[in-house]
Amino acid sequence: MDIFFVISGFLITGIIITEIQQNSFSLKQFYTRRIKRIYPAFITVMALVSFIASAIFIYNDFNKLRKTIELAIAFLSNFYLGLTQGYFDLSANENPVLHIWSLAVEGQYYLIFPLILILAYKKFREVKVLFIITLILFFILLATSFVSANFYKEVLHQPNIYYLSNLRFPELLVGSLLAIYHNLSNKVQLSKQVNNILAILSTLLLFSCLFLMNNNIAFIPGITLILPCIFTALIIHTTSQNNIR
């Protein structure tokens, strides 16, 4: 999901920044587009899953499934899953809606981040300031990855940190930072040869990370996945720069 989050952050933030600069961005229209894009397919799939599960699941399992789907509609399923089911638990393989936690994280991110961008741009009128603010947010949220897992478990009652929004937002912010950087007027321009080398190296390093990281490695999203996110961003950046040329 980390690669998906980077791509999502890059694409959606790119659209937001373009519309903000053109004075055509509307939070209402943005949220309306998101709802129209996500909910029809989501509701259809969840209805089908619920119908099938009602026939083959025992009551307790179906009740958990129902709660997950209900909270997913409000973009809160990641918190419920954090309380009830670890991503790498054996029982997770039997949960047909396990992966919708990512929609919850995305929903929360795009509920907050566009508002930060539009308010900051109205005040400062500079994309450079948006980049700095986003970078500060990135480091603040990344720092929460260093908080003890016991704190999340004992204080926040979230034993499964895999799903936590504050540990996943940095992955989306990597993509957002790249999108904002592409809109800077004084960004660094690399030669096509350098871009090609960086693209190849980033691809190799990304696959190395994916190969080396497995279920046996202690998982802390912000720390464990930040390198794959950076390599993904480098691949997007170098290939997009070559396409522009």
Curated annotation (Swiss-Prot):
GO MF term list: acyltransferase activity, transferring groups other than amino-acyl groups
Keyword Transcription included in the entry's annotation: no
Topology class, membrane: Multi-pass membrane protein
Taxonomy, superkingdom: Bacteria
Protein name (Swiss-Prot/TrEMBL): Uncharacterized protein HI_0392
Positions of transmembrane segments: 38-58, 68-88, 100-120, 129-149, 194-214, 217-237
Subcellular location: Cell membrane
Keywords linked to the UniProt accession: Cell membrane, Membrane, Transmembrane, Transmembrane helix
Record family assignment: Belongs to the acyltransferase 3 family.
Gene Ontology, cellular component aspect: plasma membrane
InterPro entries named in the record: Acyl_transf_3_dom, Acyltransferase_3
